[in-house]
Amino acid sequence: MTDWKPIPRPSPSKSHRMLTLLGPRHRYCDGIGRRSFLQIGGLACAGGFTLADIARAEAVAASAGRKLPWKSVIMVYLSGGLPHQDTFDLKPHAPKEIRGELNPIATNVPGIEISELLPQLAQCADKYSLIRSVVGQRDEHSSFQSVTGYTMDETKRDGRPSFGSMIARVQGPTDPLTPPFIDLFPTMQHRPYNSPNAGSLGASFNPVKADGEDIASMRLRYIEAQQFGRRRDLLEQLDAFRTAADRVGAMSQNYQRAFDVLASSKLVEALDVEKEDPLVRARYGKGSAKHLGDGGPLWNDQLLMARRLVEVGVRVVTVAYGFWDTHGNNFGHLKQHLPTFDTGLSALIEDLSARGLDQDVLVVVWGEFGRTPKINKDAGRDHWAPVQTALIAGGGVKTGQVIGSTDASAGYAATRPVHYRDVLATIYQNVGIDPHQFVRDANDRPIPILPEDARPVRELF
């Protein structure tokens, strides 16, 4: 596969078209049909700002003619737990009941092999590192360990915040018009998959949510693209929405912030992947916004949206991607869905590199655990907490390497065990935050970001 370059975005069309902020209808396993919509939730960066303040801030930013540098993170959470031995840590010499149906293929880095179902990722292996020895997880179906660095019990008991909320708390926004943390997780049927919020830091550090059911949030079905051409039109429209909200008593602090965020047309445009060059969007592929099982959608627009968001200054974007809880028909499931994953993730990695963003945007891809070495009677792999693989790209880290290894059955770490908290420590260090510092929560209590034994993965720096 040849290298590809980002294509300049076309100038906005003068033709009349609609900007859709409401996703397609999808149906959950419980049979309830729901719509995904743009939900602007708790937002720290715009708290207390009026629409006039936002407009003035935008004018100042425009006159400055530049933007400050920042570090961003895109985390792709693989809900359900990806089978590592069928994707990034194959064991072709193991017995058939362990190695399964898939074969390894060479990558563009000598000595590194991955699954035959990931040919595009194989051709950009020089742009990421694989940690094949991630340990320390509990057997719990939740995003909490991946997103907070703590177990679900610890997170709920102690109010541990999402790493995105912690980064928002410590570093704040890159500018007053841009939220520091946007969570693209949909509302998944299995509730522990859903992203935890700011916890003890307080609701003001909750992410902007791109899906949800909060009645007091903004729900916009369509906004005419041409309305964004004139600033006054947008402000008048938002003021009309505010007046209507006041009448029904729905004007909470978070609702106020929703209007402030929407006053920034650059954020709205970043969320509109229709504005991307068609060739770039085609490279990402599409997938579907429909949820898989009780997990996330296999929807590559999320990955493209994440890149567009970090470009406009969002510090953290979290994505829930696919459903990998393959207790049965593991190989049929992977043959159907890994090609879409391969297309989307390789596009994100290559796109960031081609745009020169690979030094500033860290990409972390992992689930809550791995899968069992031995294939079960239903041709599936069950939960396996002892080890999994994480993929790390961008952020200026060292790439084209494998860190750690597993035993002959991919069941346990054989060399260089990396605790999952070390991955979170790596994220914090990469964005310039000491993972062991204390911050003040909403009650002015000092809380540690991570335990003292969490250490950044040294091989990446």
Where is each model-derived feature located?
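Ligand-binding pockets and gating/stacking loops
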Residues: 2-4, 11-461
